[in-house]
Curated annotation (Swiss-Prot):
Belongs to the methyltransferase superfamily. L-isoaspartyl/D-aspartyl protein methyltransferase family. GO terms for molecular function: protein-L-isoaspartate (D-aspartate) O-methyltransferase activity. This is Protein-L-isoaspartate O-methyltransferase. Gene3D superfamilies: Vaccinia Virus protein VP39 (3.40.50.150). GO terms for biological process: methylation; protein modification process; protein repair. The gene is pcm.
Length: 315
């Protein structure tokens, strides 16, 4: 290159080829700034690759700083996993058992009814009533799987829900093939027996002396929307004179005898069913009392049973 040409073109041809790439990276910079950047790029070749890596050029060399963007997308790749789509799957186990139990409870009740029939309960209306009432709704959730076993289960406050066989037996004795108009239950408890009675009687009156159980029975019965049950908080030994006389009275607690007030509230021809015996439960007997005249009652002793004691007053 001649001296005159060198003055006009102070840069070599190779430098002129690289200058546009540098000017593309830093748009808006002057020719003088671009010219001064070229020697620096020649001294440090790796620095030239930085713009290439930023623009995603395919010619980035291995072992240079172009390897850094390879790790940069990783946070972006992890972002879709952060919502954890497995979370809804974790909820499935808690829902499935409850749903499965709800679907099978009807069949479990049917098997319970078959056992009742095999044990001597013959009144179809009683069997239908036992099949219609979901007993698992009246016990604690932890005991729901045992709801249709023939067992008494605790409901709190030292009280129990009676065995299905005992509930069916007492209601069948109270009915004696009749259509019941007005029934009084002493000892509402969790409300299960009242719910069964509501299927065989026009009106059911039930008294509970323990306030928390009275409130619990109301909550248990509310989803069933039973229109013919009237719950009362009070002393069961006194009965409910304002609603007497009753076609049937069912007492769900054992006393040494049947309170006279309850005998007086029984209609002529009515039947009272109650466990009678010591509070220890060793000598309790299911007893049937029939009112045959205004001042005459007939008593029959039937089955050995075990009930919580019949107490007076309210708590």
């Amino acid at each position: 290159m001649s001296g005159e040409r060198a003055k006009r073109f102070p840069l070599a041809l190779e430098d002129l080829k690289r200058a546009p790439r540098k000017s593309e990276v830093r748009s808006g910079s002057g020719e003088r700034h671009a010219a001064s950047a070229v020697p620096k790029a020649a001294d440090k070749p790796a620095a030239v690759l930085k713009p290439v890596a930023k623009t995603g050029a395919a010619r980035a060399l291995p072992g240079t700083t172009a390897a850094k963007p390879a790790t940069a997308p990783k946070p972006n790749l992890l972002k879709p996993a952060m919502p954890q789509p497995a979370a809804p799957k974790l909820a499935a186990p808690s829902i499935a058992p409850a749903g499965a139990f709800a679907l099978t409870s009807e069949r479990v009740r049917e098997r319970m009814v078959e056992r009742l029939r095999a044990n001597g309960v013959t009144d179809a209306r009683v069997l239908d009533a036992m099949a219609a009432v979901p007993r698992h709704m009246f016990v604690d959730p932890g005991l729901a799987t045992q709801a249709y076993e023939d067992a008494a289960l605790p409901i709190g406050h030292q009280q129990t829900i009676s065995k299905p066989s005992v509930v069916a037996r007492m209601i069948e004795l109270a009915m004696a093939g009749r259509t019941l108009e007005r029934v009084l239950e002493i000892g509402t408890g969790c409300g299960y027996q009242a719910a069964v009675l509501s299927h065989v009687a026009r009106d059911v009156y039930s008294i509970e002396r323990i306030k928390p159980l009275y409130e619990r029975a109301k909550l248990n019965l509310r989803p069933l929307r039973v229109p013919n049950i009237r719950l009362h908080y009070g002393d069961g030994r006194v009965g409910l004179p304002s609603a007497a006389p009753f076609d049937a009275i069912v007492i769900a607690a054992a006393g040494l005898d049947v309170p006279q007030a309850l005998l007086e509230q029984l209609a002529i021809g009515g039947r009272l069913v109650a466990p009678v015996g010591a509070q220890s439960g060793q000598h309790q007997v299911l007893t049937l009392v029939e009112r045959v005249a205004p001042a005459q009652w007939r008593e029959s002793r039937l089955d050995r049973v075990f009930f919580v004691p019949l107490k007076s007053g309210v708590i």
